[in-house]
Amino acid sequence: MSASPSSSAQQARRAIGRRLRDILRDSGITARALAHAAGWDESKCSRLINGRTLPSDDDIRVWCRICNAENEIPDLIAATRDADSMYVEWRRLQRSGMRRLQETRVSLYEETRLFRFYCSQFMPWPLQTPGYMRAVLSAFADFHDAPRDIDEAIAARSARSRLLYEGDHRFAMVMEESVLHDRIADDDVMAGQLGQLLEGMSLPSVSLGIIPSGTRRKLWTMETFSIYDDKRVFVELLSAGVTVTQPREIALYLKGFSELAGQAVYGNKARSLITAAIGALS
């Protein structure tokens, strides 16, 4: 696999290289001996260890089997796929516009049965109104100097909301109370968005919890993330959207979501927080 100019992907390759190096050291085998056993040129080991080349799935299997570290294979393979997808995702954002970015995960959304959302910055996307989407996407386009195909992006994102009403999809959503009060848009748009939360939480497919401000925290406020079944996590950072597929990392996000959900209030208590946010609009 050829090198990517993306700094995120480069960092991921270096991290994978460090893991390969640690596995090699723990095995007591030299790079020369590994290369000989694998039938590789010794320079290939150097490229993999130094992160200049991203290993293929077969490279990882061979490396780990020679080093007697087969248990590392699933996480390493997942990590290499994460590294590659980071770059592809960023390239799509920069070259193809926001509509394309909204459409990249449609098949994943349709296949997912249980969605888990933790939202510390924005409303969960299945419950966003078009007006709120416009405000968020406009700010995003301005900050990242992205193509402003906002109408098309709104249409693509809105189309995904049909999953709330179709099939056997379930949505577990946890929000920080501060999200209710962040003025991402004007008061009319915010009132409509907050009203949409009230409507959405009554759907049989939706569980909406809100972590009240001032709650004694068992787990700190963190970046917005979403979990798709138990297979994939997306984390939203300022510089990039990060894909996580390594099983042990996913397990940490599942644990984190469970703890955050345990700090939230639901039902009438959540409705009271939303109603108070509507009342606070001027």
Regions found by a protein language model. Give the residues of each.
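C-terminal regulatory/effector modules of DNA-binding transcriptional regulators
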Residues: 186-282
